[in-house]
Swiss-Prot record:
Function of the protein: Specifically dimethylates two adjacent adenosines (A1518 and A1519) in the loop of a conserved hairpin near the 3'-end of 16S rRNA in the 30S particle. May play a critical role in biogenesis of 30S subunits.
GO MF entries: 16S rRNA (adenine(1518)-N(6)/adenine(1519)-N(6))-dimethyltransferase activity; RNA binding
Record NCBIfam families: ksgA
Entry keywords, A to Z: Cytoplasm, Methyltransferase, RNA-binding, rRNA processing, S-adenosyl-L-methionine, Transferase
Protein name listed in UniProt: Ribosomal RNA small subunit methyltransferase A
Compartments where located: Cytoplasm
Lineage: Bacteria, Bacillati, Cyanobacteriota, Cyanophyceae, Nostocales
GO cellular component terms, semicolon-separated: cytosol
Organism name: Nostoc sp. (strain PCC 7120 / SAG 25.82 / UTEX 2576)
Classification via SUPFAM superfamilies: S-adenosyl-L-methionine-dependent methyltransferases
One Pfam entry name: RrnaAD
Amino acid sequence: MVRPRKLFAQHWLKSEKALDAIVKAAECSTNDRILEIGPGTGILTRRLLPAVQSLVAVEIDRDLCELLAKQLGKKENFLLLQGDFLTIDLAANLGSFPKFQKPNKVVANIPYNITGPIIEKLLGTISNPNLEPFDSIVLLIQKEVAERLYAKSGSRTFGALSVRVQYLADCEFICDVPASAFHPPPKVDSAVVRLRPRQIEIPVNDPKRLENLVKLGFGAKRKMLRNNLQSVVDRDRLSQLLEQLNINPQARAEDISTQQWVKLANLLGVE
């Protein structure tokens, strides 16, 4: 049996309840082509394989790849790629495997220390969104990060990550997963979330401007927005724009919804 390695922040999920919740949230059908990131020992993989058309798993750990190849390698709808998901060229690696090309769903228990970069690779960014979005992305991640993904404006957890992700996808909380559901147990609790990439309701005219505004706006979270953004717009002018959007001029960054951030960026674009 391969032991979890700290180098790769590995924690094996062992809870049947959590596994059931993940599989249910994925809403798999026999037409689905699944991408799994970090399959580990394959406990989730085994649940998914009978229900889907194909599953491609990307695993960085060579020892785990040997284990998975030995146990699941003969499954016709299973393909294993050894490598770092953040750097691997998925399309190029799948070029010779038509059955596994263009996965339409992601289901994964991902390493918590690289959650942000993984989500960015899956969704893209405000200025460079994924042009071939997945139908859905179901992730088991650190609870604190999960709360930021689906946070509403006005809450203490709403931040720059919330805006960047919610601009590109609908975010839904599925369930909490305690540390005891893993071996070894991590130092934090976890949660399952589902992201559904969608059409942008209010397109931003200048994506780079929006990214810059969000970065500056949340730079000093407890300060009023007109103070954080004074390097790009006069305080009095910003107060006028906020009032035009029915936003309190004394608002802080976390008080403004994703759509309001977009509207503000668009107004500044016609200055």
